[in-house]
Amino acid sequence: MSQTQPFLARVANGSLVIQIIVGIVAGILLASVAPESAISVGFLGGLFVSALKAVAPILVFILVASSIANQKKGAHTNMKPIIMLYLFGTLMAALTAVVMSFLFPTTLTLVAGNATASPPEGIAEVLNTLLFKIVDNPVNALMSGNFIGILAWAIALGFALHQASDATKQVFHDMSNGVTSIVRFVIRLAPIGIFGLVANTFAETGFAALAGYAHLLAVLLGSMAVIALVVNPAIVFFKTKENPYPLVFRCIRESGITAFFTRSSAANIPVNMQLCKDLDLHEDTYSVSIPLGATINMAGAAITITVLTLAAVHTMGVEVDIATAVLLSVVAAVSACGASGVAGGSLLLIPLACSLFGIPNEVAMQVVAVGFIIGVIQDSAETALNSSTDVLFTAAACKAAEAKVASPNIA
């Protein structure tokens, strides 16, 4: 027994990233050697993702309400620069995707799509959906994982509790610590969950179905890599005036890898919250910016919408001028910010973007079907970029604010 405890302690306190890498390798090996067994352990991945999704809504609600209720007068949360970074980053992602699509034009072999969900008819419908999510029933928002609604109610409750007694505020603070402890335990299970996810994915698809769309995937993943490794670091450097890459690589390593395999920005919120805490960021800031980022910071979605739309344009032989391409970037960026309010996410916003070029809805839905075929990779990479950027921009804004306070005379 005395030997077992140190071993378990070493596992519990060991490097989570190394354990996740071991889980990935083990999952690939199991899928290669025994596909049936790999499929059977897929439930481990499902359990892990479900646990993250279950704890995320209550974590956001309690943490936001507690941080706002306990916020001291005159405290700054840096939310304005973070939101500006989110929006600017999403627009830059769409513009980068346009450039990549023109440099490496893609044509598609369209397939008959069986996507039964209805795409939105316009940006107004997307924005309308988001507005109604804000005034959702709080219980329903928690049950359905509607983070816009959860944020709205948590912020309102936090402000309402500003005048509450210290004892009441302490209760929320203690609840926040309790939920955070539960989240920390769930995150330690990531290696087991990712092992199940990887094993199941490799055993079921083998990625053979993706071979016919190698060029499209190369443009998609190339655009995301440019954003993650060139554009985002440039934005962070401009904001912080220091080497951005240590922070960039840490966000990719500790947030992006988990998000890649869970394929859910909502499920990755607890992971991002923990990373922000490890980075010693201000809780009043990240408790709001991280769930907000999971809703509106959608660089990956903007890339997906733009690349697949321009692939449809090239396939149909439609001529595109620079002005229309820029307009597409804006539409893709605005649509991407509303992607969380659409069933099917970024893929079902493709018909909306295709309508700019007069492409029939039937053809656009075939492009959506292609998106579902490559979704194993596309959705994973998109989520990894979206989620890791939430932490990156939050940290950049916090560091810039700290530097400004430390050197008030420097512009």
Swiss-Prot record:
Instruction: Please provide, alphabetically and separated by semicolons, the GO molecular function terms listed in this UniProt record.
Output: neutral L-amino acid:sodium symporter activity
Keyword Cell inner membrane recorded:
yes
On whether Transmembrane is a keyword of this UniProt record, the answer is: yes
Report the main location listed first in the record: membrane
Topology with respect to the bilayer: Multi-pass membrane protein
InterPro entries according to UniProt: Na-dicarboxylate_symporter (IPR001991), Na:dicarbo_symporter_sf (IPR036458), Ser_Thr_transp_SstT (IPR023025)
Which BP terms from GO are recorded? serine transport; threonine transport
Cellular component GO terms, alphabetically? plasma membrane
Q: Which UniProt keywords apply?
A: Amino-acid transport, Cell inner membrane, Cell membrane, Membrane, Symport, Transmembrane, Transmembrane helix, Transport
Q: Which reaction does it catalyse?
A: L-serine(in) + Na(+)(in) = L-serine(out) + Na(+)(out); L-threonine(in) + Na(+)(in) = L-threonine(out) + Na(+)(out)
> What are the transmembrane regions?
14-34, 43-63, 82-102, 141-161, 192-212, 218-238, 290-310, 330-350, 357-377
Which family does this protein fall into?
Answer: Belongs to the dicarboxylate/amino acid:cation symporter (DAACS) (TC 2.A.23) family.
**Would you tell me the protein name for this molecule?**
Serine/threonine transporter SstT
Recorded source organism is Photobacterium profundum (strain SS9)
What is the organism lineage in this UniProt record?
Answer: Bacteria, Pseudomonadati, Pseudomonadota, Gammaproteobacteria, Vibrionales
Q: Per UniProt, what is the name of the gene that codes for the protein in this document? A: sstT
